[in-house]
Amino acid sequence: FPLVLSAARLGSIKPGNAVTYREVKVGEVTGYELGQTADRVLIRVLIEPRYAALVHTGSRFWETSGFGVDFSLFKGASVRTDSLESLIEGGVAFATPDGEQMGRRALPGQTFALFKEPQEEWFGWAPKIELGRAASDK
């Protein structure tokens, strides 16, 4: 199930990087190119067919490369990392909201913005979405 992610810069993303949903690999980056007017990078990803139902018009994608550190005088330091694989390799993660925010199922080839980092609320999204069957499950 092909999708396109649009970003200002490529960053550390490269073909073969994982695309994850809830830290489970559901696809991978297949390539990239400059957009038609060279002001964006278009990153091609392929979601495994059985996981295509996870992607809706309200889904949000973000980079998982590296780790983030947030330091506050009163809170101490908090470190944000994704899976060890994405920490080393980089990659893309996404989340899909509940209810009306979810929107319709994405269409093949649909374009989504790729955010540099996630918003905290995205981690709280937990819609129940029926998954498709992979050909190997039959």
What are these regions (language model features)?
Residues 1-138:
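Extracytoplasmic/periplasmic terminal helices and flexible tails
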